[in-house]
Amino acid sequence: MNIQRAKEIVESPDMKKVTYNGVPIYIQHVNEETGTARIYPLDEPQEEHEVQLNSLKED
């Protein structure tokens, strides 16, 4: 996923279907400098991770 699209998803009021390794996730924050996003699985909000944007897929 590119940085611009990830930022659009974060700013959107609508929930978008995004996955990380096949797991549905929520994007909390996009770091443009490092090309990463802070995410968590929808079913485990306490499990935050910092991942590369190119590992995220929009369904």
UniProtKB/Swiss-Prot annotation:
Induction comment: Expressed only in the forespore compartment of sporulating cells. Disappears after 45 minutes of spore germination. Expression is sigma G-dependent.
GO cellular component, one term: endospore-forming forespore
InterPro entries given in the database record: SASP_SspH
Cellular compartments annotated: Spore core
Tree of life domain: Bacteria
One GO biological process term: sporulation resulting in formation of a cellular spore
Principal subcellular localization: other
Bilayer-spanning residue ranges: none
This protein's UniProt keywords: Sporulation
Family from the record: Belongs to the SspH family.
Name of the protein in question: Small, acid-soluble spore protein H
